[in-house]
């Protein structure tokens, strides 16, 4: 009996140290920043059994075996389609403003495409109005409607959109709906799934959460994009999930979610369509390449000087592209930089870029919500305040709800709008999308919106912040240690 007991104990001990050695090796061979690597190593050594479990859930960036195989071959096939798109020279805007030149060169060199022209481009800030415009566009659709969202929560205005989709599918419009499994769990547990499928809508549950497969696929890689495509001509993207803001997370008592969406008419829908096609193929194995744009798309063009790039991230997409674009945009600022983000846990490079911008004379403002739905992110964000304030950055805390908008405005000319939060999950893990827009009219509109956010915010006083309670500083340091893992 003692021999058997000692054998089991020896086996457990050996397995434990083999796991520790394996994880240590995996962390060290990855070219990640030092704080990220140190956080993981300290986690598995200080809280070993829990740390090992956390690693298998969240440590490696990988998809399921079938999805990974599809993702690896996606761009080789899509590149053929992109080569055909390049022949449509009439959709490209070759010239850019001075402040946007660097980021558009980055996009051109890495993605292979110049900026895209647009017929109309509009910023939308009122969720009720956004839903009304969207429902109108759905009913006016002639060929196809494609959507992807992180969260679709049944109830209120979201049900109105669902009914519009069902009615459109019944009249012969080809409708595809892709929703993240974790974010839209309430939707997939509701009758809407069956109702939609019976009407002819193709509904796909993206990145299915399956606890039996946690050792085969990372569970916190999420489909975080928000895209709506109609007739290969109208495109929506931004921070808004398909939820009624008057009903969403009311119990959290943080107030209404404040979002920002962009509605664009023109060939940019084609570029966003190839991203949707890749996502759809990863989930279903089926390729649905969009049609090439025609010249009629740009007739009566109202934004003749506007240029747009679309940047996508996630497994199978260009590595570090969004992170590089953010850095390039920040370093391009000469006069003013305004950043709006609900979650502020930047990488060391982004933190350095923001501080450097302020130190070279750029007026830098960061707008974040005073109230947050994530206690972890709330405290992790606070640890960066001192360094930012010391560099001369103005930090505004929005008081009228959860500011969920994600935007960057450089010199009132270059705008970045999309789904990316300034945290590790958005920058390195999730499927995200960012629109890069070079247009002074659009920039002025975004500037007005951001100024409205600022007027509804309180400015953090540098002196008062330096006198905050000692226990708060301790909590901040604890969450700073965890920040690379968030």
Curated annotation (Swiss-Prot):
One BP term from GO: cardiolipin biosynthetic process
Catalytic reactions of this protein: 2 a 1,2-diacyl-sn-glycero-3-phospho-(1'-sn-glycerol) = a cardiolipin + glycerol
One GO MF term: cardiolipin synthase activity
EC number: 2.7.8.-
Main EC class the enzyme belongs to: transferase
Location relative to the cell: Cell inner membrane
Domain of life: Bacteria
A single Gene Ontology CC term: plasma membrane
Residue span(s) of domain PLD phosphodiesterase: 219-246, 399-426
Transmembrane segments: 3-23, 38-58
UniProt entry keywords in alphabetical sequence: Cell inner membrane, Cell membrane, Lipid biosynthesis, Lipid metabolism, Membrane, Phospholipid biosynthesis, Phospholipid metabolism, Repeat, Transferase, Transmembrane, Transmembrane helix
Cell wall biogenesis/degradation among keywords: no
Keyword Nucleotidyltransferase listed: no
Membrane topology of the entry: Multi-pass membrane protein
Active site per UniProt: 224, 226, 231, 404, 406, 411
Pfam families, per database record: PLDc_2, PLDc_N
Physiological role: Catalyzes the reversible phosphatidyl group transfer from one phosphatidylglycerol molecule to another to form cardiolipin (CL) (diphosphatidylglycerol) and glycerol.
Family, as annotated: Belongs to the phospholipase D family. Cardiolipin synthase subfamily. ClsA sub-subfamily.
Name listed for the protein in its UniProt record: Cardiolipin synthase A
Gene encoding the protein: clsA
